[in-house]
């Protein structure tokens, strides 16, 4: 079997339809159960400790992979009236950034930063944090929630984030873990969620495939959840003066999400941050990591 790997989250949001498709997926009962509810439960359980770490000084909240801003809302609600804050959403999708800016502005809790770096990948983070660290806003709280870290090559993203942080800056990371029940729980849930197929198939449809030429699949291997499509018949796709031949049975990997074992995840975080605390759900399926540089 030939396997083509085009798993790059930049391809998820090339159009507004794709971005909205992801927001629709997030609302599905399966996604709510697998990611959002788990993360919110951990945040609520440990919010006092997180706020203690954040302190009372004015703070920039830098929301990495902001989506429509809802992941940041819970923190901003708790911080409201306690500290001066500025909110800065970062996302590759301009559509997502618009939604996040609008949502947080309506909360009326502090300054919302709109500048050229809002729509950006995570390679430009150093520019972001330097610009924001001005006046009385010397401290940054980075949010990397909703399994966003898992959708990237772990060390590359952690390296970029750490390089953009100043001494004393904090990052909060929400990510799934491998509790040796991923196959029964997450894989099955993802396979049975039609909105996942609807969302990820858009990538291949933009490339020229028809929906009836591909078959959705999910598997867990090498510490990561892979979403892939199997080609159902021979097909050639042409663009400009180039043609690519795909054969029946070929597989195209369109997305991955790393789920490490707790000890392995901890060891990776300790490579980049001096102070790391892991808060883990009782079933060891999800963690909230509070890290300080």
PLM region spans:
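Short hydrophobic/aromatic beta-strand or adjacent loop that forms the aromatic wall/cage
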Residues: 224-226, 284-290
């Amino acid at each position: 079997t030939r396997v083509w790997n085009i798993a790059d989250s930049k391809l998820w949001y090339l159009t507004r339809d794709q971005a909205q498709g992801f927001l629709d997926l997030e609302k599905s009962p399966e996604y709510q159960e697998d990611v959002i509810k788990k993360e919110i439960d951990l945040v609520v359980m440990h919010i006092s400790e997180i706020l203690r770490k954040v302190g009372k000084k004015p703070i920039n909240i830098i929301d990495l992979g902001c989506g429509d801003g809802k992941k940041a809302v819970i923190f901003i609600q708790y911080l409201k009236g306690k500290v001066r804050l500025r909110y800065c959403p970062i996302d590759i999708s301009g559509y997502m950034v618009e939604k996040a800016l609008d949502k947080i502005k309506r909360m009326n809790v502090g300054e919302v930063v709109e500048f050229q770096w809002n729509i950006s990948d995570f390679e430009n983070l150093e520019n972001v944090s330097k610009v924001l660290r001005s006046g009385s806003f010397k401290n940054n709280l980075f949010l990397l929630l909703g399994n966003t870290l898992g959708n990237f090559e772990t060390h590359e993203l952690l390296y970029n984030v750490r390089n953009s942080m100043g001494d004393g800056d904090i990052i909060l990371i929400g990510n799934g873990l491998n509790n040796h029940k991923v196959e029964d729980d997450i894989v099955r849930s993802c396979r049975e969620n039609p909105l996942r197929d609807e969302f990820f198939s858009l990538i291949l449809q933009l490339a020229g495939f028809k929906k009836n030429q591909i078959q959705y699949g999910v598997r867990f291997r090498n510490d990561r959840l892979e979403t892939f499509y199997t080609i159902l018949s021979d097909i050639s796709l042409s663009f400009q003066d180039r043609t690519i031949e795909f054969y029946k049975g070929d597989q195209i990997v369109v997305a991955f999400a790393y789920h490490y074992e707790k000890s392995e995840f901890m060891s990776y975080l300790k490579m980049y941050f001096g102070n790391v605390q892991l808060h883990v759900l009782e079933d060891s399926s999800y963690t909230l990591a509070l890290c300080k540089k």
